[in-house]
Each structure stands twice: as structure tokens, then as C-alpha cells.
Amino acid sequence: GITFHRVIEGFMAQSGDPTGTGSGGPGYTFDNEPSPLRRHDTVGTVSMANAGLRNGLGTNGSQFFITFGPTPHLDGKHTVFGEVTDGMDTVMAIPERDPGMSREPGMAIKSITVTES
């Protein structure tokens, strides 16, 4: 499975990299699509990760993150596309991990269900 390759306590858990290193992607990129109607204002916000360059233009791919609390400084910089509605206790239990400090794979994702509401 895919791992949570970057986990920062009190901030977020990042996943979606097929290589598990933080530097991989799906082989394509697309522009950031932030909306003023979707904000990083609560625990469990799900957003696209990007390179943080050019306001995310052409740097979104397969990576995403789940916030551990409100992160308003990310508004307008990352596209919010969902929220965790069940199982946030599991998300909060993901162990801290810095890919720059460890080459070992992160925690494997066993199952995630995404639904439209």
C-alpha cells in the first residue's frame, strides 16, 4: 500500500506518493485550484499537496495531506477537496515521520474509503 511518508505532529499527515519517499508522483501534474469557499479551518481537512512554488501552478499530482488542526496559513495555497468524517482517531495515531531523516517506508495505508456527500 501507499504510506504516510511525512507526518508532522500537530500539523498534518501526507500521503499519496507511490514511491513512499515524498518525491514521487503519478507521472503528470496539474494546477492548484484553491477556492475561498473551502478552508483549512478544522481537524481532518483533506487537501492536495504541492511543491509550494508559483502558488501551486503545475505542481499538484497524487500527493495529499490530512490536517491535525486548523491551518489557515494554507488557505489559497492548497486545494481543499474533502474532510475526514469518521476515523479521525486513526489519523491522529499515525506516527510522526520525517522523510529527510528516515529512508524506511512510512506507515502503510490498509484501507481508505472516499465518499461524496
Segments the model singles out, each with a brief description of its role:
Residues 1-117:
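Cyclophilin-like peptidyl-prolyl cis-trans isomerases
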